[in-house]
Amino acid sequence: MQRVLNKIISKDTINTMGKVAISKKVEKLRTFMKDQSLSAYIVPSEDAHQSEYICVKDKRREYISGFSGSAGCVVITLDNQLLWTDGRYWLQAEKELESNWKIMKDRVVGEPTIQDWLLSNLNKENKVGIDSRLISKGYYDSMKLVLKEKSIDIKFDEDGENLIDKVRESFKDEEEIPEYPKNSIFFLEDKFTGKQSNEKLKEIREEMKKQSADLMVVSALDEIAWLLNLRGSDISFNPVFLSYVVVEHEKVTLFVDESKLNDKTKSQLPSGIAISPYSSVFEYLRNSDKQGKKIWIDPRSSVALYNCVSISNLLEKINPILLSKAIKNETEIQGMKNAHIRDAVALIQFLAWMEEEIVEKSDETSHTEYSVCEKLEGFRRQQTDFVSLSFDTISSINANGAIIHYKPDETTSATIVKGMYLVDSGAQYLDGTTDVTRTLHYGKPTQHEIDCYTRVLRGHVGLSLLKFPNRVNGRDIDCVARTHLWSVGLDYAHGTGHGVGSFLNVHEGPQGISYRAIANPTNLQAGMTLTNEPGYYESGNFGIRIENVMIVAPVTTQFNNGKFIGFDNITLVPYERKLINLEMLTKDEINFINDYYKEIGEKILPLIEKTNNQKSINWLKNQIKPL
């Protein structure tokens, strides 16, 4: 299995932008658009499984625009080229896009959505092109509803031929066309999953019976991996594999490149499973439709899947896997806790090393934002059951910290100097996924920096302390983390928390904590894992973010109402002492931090002491002294 895991560790190595100029690619795309009488062409970020993180071959939006953020959608007309992205990426987009591109602020009140902009800027009966594999049924329906006002038609790519792929093919002599990965798939043992795949399938089939469904189509990659207790490495940082699954009452069909499955993995598959070629899922659904079978498809799935099924045979409904996966069982919860303990050991060793290198040896050493990432990864690799990072490490000094999802480049990243340093990182372990952010200061912080950090910390602590009814969803409590920033007119342009998978995707739904309307709003429930990550970003100066992973858990209250829940912090890394203004904290906030430091002392300090690294031991002891 180690050979498989090493493939997950490796990052995408193909330069998706290549040698061909962006303007030349856009020009070629417009030629193809004219051939098909298209007035606009939409290039989403997602792949055929609506994944946030995708393999190199599916990075079509980055290929045609040069924007490398994980979220965003491009619209190209015959005269305009626009990128919609959210507040995490506005500064990054300004840096990466050429000057003739327009950045549109996604999910901001008062700013036009893609469909609103198309309605205002296209003429009646114009045609908009998109690949039906890359747009979800839910989003397609909402777009179609808006555009029908002008009878604007959404036209799907002819014969499934994506126009960006055609552009790539046109320049194949000038730059390499990436291939889909063929990495091996492996079985994840019961000691990590806590539930066998056959048990999960039994529960799914019971739900299918309730809905009178003959088939259920599963297209989300993390849901497939969870359901079958399999993991892969087709997408960097995400232990998933390109596939579809169709669940029936007597069998399961896994649509996948069979070469990825060795004999041992095949022998570990659940009973009654058949293997079919990856792309044959569409024909399989068409044949099932002809037989009059009731087919359950999740509205988050692609239009291409829906187009295989007649309306009379369709059941359009969120599948039960989404929620089942989000609510961790006892084995997964313990695994997440164990993974975070080992991850804390790695991060604390790194932070102690940084303090020594940047502060104590500042005249002797020189480190960049990129080079220190490699040092941090090295500490994580030493931990038991480490598989890979869970996303590209965000390592940013001073002004770069204001770029919320800043990614340091090997050749252009800044030298680490004294000032505000933000590091957002995480790892994949066989027993859990981690995501943690700490903001440090190497030097003497200003009073303004201390004030801003303390306000972010108070929001972070306030959310950690919150007790609330189990009928509450994440949107209801998002403001708790913002209140101390709002009181002085400050805010941050991202959600406060996202779900985290168990050795799966670092971003997991449906749970989340955000002021925005959540696509699949669901009440927070015991067993869910979420991040708590308020921040503040001052363009040109610094960025602050503090992030822990928390598990939703039952809590006791004064009146012992068993229907209340709260959060259990499982990230165990100290905050930055020199950035905390004690006079701004309440007694409850100080008590929380001191209790947190006591827990770190009990669970992490003994493990740091076992490393025999006196610098790390001294650093941690100093950091967790009571406030």
Swiss-Prot record:
Pfam families: Creatinase_N, Creatinase_N_2, Peptidase_M24, Peptidase_M24_C. A peptide binds at R88, H405, H498, H507, E533. It comes from Dictyostelium discoideum (Social amoeba). The gene is xpnpep1. It is an enzyme of class 3 (hydrolase). Belongs to the peptidase M24B family. Mn(2+) 1 binds at D424, D435, E547. Its EC number is 3.4.11.9. Coiled coil: none annotated. Metalloaminopeptidase that catalyzes the removal of a penultimate prolyl residue from the N-termini of peptides, such as Arg-Pro-Pro. This is Xaa-Pro aminopeptidase 1.
